[in-house]
Each structure stands twice: as structure tokens, then as C-alpha cells.
């Protein structure tokens, strides 16, 4: 059975390990190993994750299938019912089986959002198509200098709920 479990600071090592596995599998062909290494160190180091938990009020969820953790997501609230999905990652073995759509459905039932916004790399065609399938629409193009000569070149996408 698929579950979303609220993560705590005790789960940081699980989140970091999953990020390494998923990013090295999924993102190396898109942005290259050096940028993957840089971003993993920048975003998933202990201090950065603690800041996301404590200062930025991000809520992390572990995605569990039976007893195994197969991914995680991170969301924050822009208002009472508008949310930003910062991270949404599932291990490759669990992709293309309806898992991602089921996770979004569960998240929607938990949050009862008016909207969910996210950013996705413009070359991440599999994820873009997944979000289109789940009724997200591109609202803008973003280019963000993340340091060390790297840029994030993203589409911002949003899904509105009734």
C-alpha cells in the first residue's frame, strides 16, 4: 500500500541517500555529473536540510510502498491553500507504474489545495510529460544562477484545483 509519511529531522539521512540515488540515475544525463554533485552538496547537506525544515517551513514526506521508502517530496505553503512543490522524487524502479500520480492524488487529499506550483528542468522531458498528464500547465520560464557557473533552466508549472 502506498503511503505518504510526514518526515522528521530523524529522516534526513534517508532523504539524503535517496536524493543521491535518484539524482545520479535521473539527472546526470540531463545536467551532467559535475552539476549533480554540486547541487546534491548544496541542497542536501545537513545544514541546508535543517534550514528547509526550520526556517523555510518546508514539510517533507517520505513516500512508502509497503515497508520500503521509495521516494520523498517537499512542499511549502504560499498561502492557506496555495502550495509550492519543491521536490518530488521516486526511485526509478517505482516509476512508470502509476506511483507518481497516486502520490499526487494522496497529496491533494491531504492538502486540499487551490493550487500546486513547481519548477522542472526544461530538458527533463519525462517529468514534464508526467506533469502534463496530471494537468499541470507551464506558466513561465525561469533561469536561476545557482553559483559555481551553473544555472537552473526551468519551466514553472501550476495545477489549479476546484
What are the language-model segments listed below?
Residues 114-128, 132-137, 141-162:
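C-terminal "cap" of GNAT-fold acetyltransferases
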Amino acid at each position: 500500500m502506498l503511503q505518504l509519511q510526514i518526515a522528521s529531522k530523524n529522516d534526513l539521512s534517508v532523504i539524503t541517500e535517496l536524493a543521491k540515488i535518484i539524482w545520479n540515475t535521473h539527472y546526470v544525463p540531463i545536467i551532467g555529473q559535475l552539476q549533480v554533485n554540486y547541487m546534491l552538496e548544496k541542497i542536501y547537506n545537513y545544514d541546508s536540510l535543517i534550514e528547509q525544515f526550520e526556517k523555510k517551513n518546508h514539510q517533507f514526506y517520505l513516500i512508502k510502498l509497503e515497508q520500503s521508502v521509495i521516494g520523498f517530496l517537499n512542499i511549502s505553503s504560499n498561502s492557506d491553500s496555495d502550495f509550492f512543490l519543491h521536490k518530488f522524487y521516486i526511485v526509478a524502479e517505482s516509476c512508470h507504474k502509476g506511483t507518481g500520480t497516486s502520490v499526487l492524488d494522496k497529496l491533494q487529499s491531504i492538502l486540499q489545495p487551490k493550487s500546486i506550483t513547481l519548477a522542472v528542468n526544461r530538458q527533463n522531458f519525462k517529468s514534464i510529460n508526467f506533469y502534463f498528464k496530471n494537468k499541470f500547465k507551464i506558466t513561465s520560464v525561469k533561469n536561476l544562477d545557482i553559483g559555481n557557473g551553473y544555472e537552473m533552466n526551468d519551466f514553472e508549472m501550476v495545477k489549479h484545483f476546484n
